[in-house]
Swiss-Prot record:
The modification N5-methylglutamine is found at Q251. Pfam families: PCRF, RF-1. The lineage of its organism: Bacteria, Pseudomonadati, Campylobacterota, Epsilonproteobacteria, Nautiliales. InterPro entries: PCRF (IPR005139), Pep_chain_release_fac_I (IPR000352), Pep_chain_release_fac_I_sf (IPR045853), PrfB (IPR004374). It comes from Nautilia profundicola (strain ATCC BAA-1463 / DSM 18972 / AmH). Keywords: Cytoplasm, Methylation, Protein biosynthesis. The keyword Ubl conjugation does not apply. Belongs to the prokaryotic/mitochondrial release factor family. This is Peptide chain release factor 2.
Length: 367
């Protein structure tokens, strides 16, 4: 990097900080923190645990955003000051240090951009993910299990917790169906980018002829809804089946006659839960999953109407990403239009860059 490239990058980063400031509105956030402080000083505030917990969550989110914003702004100014000083003194060693540091600064500001983007009320929620293999038997069942492992590893990298809700093993390999809850900071905000059809192209390990196969699996992501969100479901619209828990879902899946599957007849949505020995608790969780999916479907519908999208682009039914393992190696996302060659890393859960590129592309599309 030379002085010209540095100054161009600094201009770009300054513009980003200005844009972030206009969206974040730090003064308003500081004012809201003072309001929360006044609320906390009232004894009545703590008498309502539900409300106080909600406000505490809001406070922590504000503090996190302000801290990241201040850190980025200060680091940018410090870097510029150091560059000016090193330039005046013609200190090559310090200049190289400044050029290296500005790359780290780029990453800090990108993280802040993503944080600001995840400001929708649902982004902070936990995420419920369901993976359904497409047609193709063992091939697609195996592909579903590869995706499942990818998300488990991604959650692990981000420090999120995972709770398996429903797991049906494939007859020969892989999985027929899996649903799991991801708990963590902005879990839905990040994972909503995974909603859609995922396509795999590879030489099949199950084909003795070594032929190339294409497999599909759909990933559905819904925010775990709070109890205070009202979703009306007519009992006549659902069918409830009870069965014995099955599959290799790990130690969290029990083996008693308590697994519950609920079918929502008008939409065809099917949800299941088999984590608890209590049929009653599994039914409650399955109903929560159904409500979350109906809520997500309604959000998609409203978004599509606002953007004037045709009906066939709504919901979970469109292809979003291809993973090609043969004849070359590449992951290509249809929304960001970006391609990545580090396929093994991505399938091992290194998804941050891929997801962030999607979030940025979608934000630019909105604007």
């Amino acid at each position: 990097m030379d002085a010209y490239e540095y100054s161009e990058l600094i201009k770009e980063l300054e513009n980003k900080i200005e844009n972030i400031e206009s969206i974040l509105k730090p003064e308003k956030l500081e004012a809201r923190l003072k309001e929360i402080e006044e609320l906390e000083n009232s004894p009545d505030f703590w008498n309502d645990p539900k409300t106080s917990a909600k406000v505490q969550k809001e406070k922590n989110a504000i503090l996190r955003k302000l801290e990241k914003y201040k850190k980025a702004k200060t680091a940018l100014q410090d870097n510029k000051d150091m560059f000016e000083l090193a330039s005046m003194e013609e200190d090559e060693e310090t200049l190289n240090e400044v050029f290296n540091d500005v790359q780290d600064l780029k990453k800090i500001i990108r993280d802040l951009e993503i944080e600001v983007m995840l400001s929708d009320e649902n982004d902070a929620k936990n995420a419920i993910i369901s993976i359904h293999p497409g047609a193709g038997g063992t091939e697609s069942h195996d592909w579903a299990s590869i995706l499942y492992r990818m998300y488990l590893r991604y959650a692990e990298r981000r420090g999120w917790k995972v709770e398996v809700l429903d797991y049906q093993a494939g007859d020969e390999a892989g999985i027929k169906d899996v649903s799991f809850l991801v708990k963590g900071e902005n879990a839905y905000g990040y994972l909503k980018a995974e909603n859609g059809i995922h396509r795999l192209v590879r030489v099949s390990p199950f084909d003795s002829g070594g032929r190339r196969h294409t497999s599909f699996a759909s990933v559905q992501v819904s925010p775990e809804i709070d109890d205070d969100i009202e979703i009306e479901i007519d009992p006549k619209d659902i069918r409830i089946d009870v069965f014995r828990a099955s599959g290799a879902g790990g130690q969290h899946v029990n083996k008693t006659e308590s697994a519950v599957r609920i079918t929502h007849i008008p939409t065809g949505i099917v949800v299941g839960c088999q984590t608890d020995r209590s049929q009653h608790k599994n039914k409650d969780m399955a109903m929560k999953m159904l409500k979350s999916k109906l809520y997500e479907l309604e959000l998609e519908k409203r978004k599509a109407e606002e953007e004037g999208k045709p009906k066939d682009e709504m919901g979970w039914g469109h292809q979003i990403r291809s993973y090609v393992l043969f004849p070359y190696q590449q992951v290509k996302d249809n929304r960001s239009n970006k391609a990545y060659s580090r396929v093994d890393d991505i399938l091992d859960g290194d998804l941050d860059e891929v997801i962030e590129d999607v979030l940025i592309a979608e934000k630019e599309h909105e604007n």
